[in-house]
């Protein structure tokens, strides 16, 4: 059984026809986009890929931030190329916002998506695993399903492994 078949079987009772994937430039983006494409019904489905630039309160919300915009557009182009392998309609969008979590939830409402897919890196904060601030906000406030795709735990160096 392929990964696609196993994934589809898990959500078979509730077909997903539209998914919002949030990309950030992390290595987990590609896996998140592929996962979302595999969840979608291939006929008449829509994939929304969203890259958000968080704008500091010291700047106007519509400030032109050329380096961030260029990076976001490059990431969106890469993710669109990945989604072309799958047979779903893809829409990519770059959005400027003060708070990413709020913007993601609002986009999910505006687009009436069936699910949100977030790819998150494995990260630690103060020695403990952390999923950051955005994922908990989305899990709490999104009106639809939310799937988290976390990267594997990075291998520890032999020095760290032998001291614990």
Where are the language model's segments positioned?
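Small/aliphatic-rich secondary-structure junction motif
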Residues: 8-66, 82-84, 88
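General small-molecule cofactor/ligand-binding pocket signal
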Residues: 48-50, 91-95, 147
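Short secondary-structure boundary segments
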Residues: 51, 119-121, 150-151
């Amino acid at each position: 059984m392929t990964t696609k078949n196993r994934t589809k079987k898990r959500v078979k009772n509730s077909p997903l026809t539209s998914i919002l994937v949030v990309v950030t430039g992390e290595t987990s983006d590609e896996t998140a986009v592929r996962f979302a494409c595999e969840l979608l019904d291939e006929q008449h489905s829509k994939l929304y890929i969203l890259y958000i630039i968080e704008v500091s309160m010291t700047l106007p919300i519509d400030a032109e931030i050329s380096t961030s915009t260029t990076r976001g557009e490059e990431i969106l182009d890469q993710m669109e190329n990945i989604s072309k392998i799958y047979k779903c309609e893809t829409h990519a969008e770059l959005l400027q916002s003060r708070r990413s979590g709020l913007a993601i939830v609002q986009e999910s409402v505006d687009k009436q998506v069936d699910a949100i897919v977030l790819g998150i890196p494995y990260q630690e904060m103060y020695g403990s695993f952390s999923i950051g601030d955005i994922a908990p906000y989305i899990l709490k406030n999104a009106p639809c399903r939310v799937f988290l795709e976390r990267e594997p735990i990075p291998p520890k160096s032999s020095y760290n492994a032998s001291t614990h």
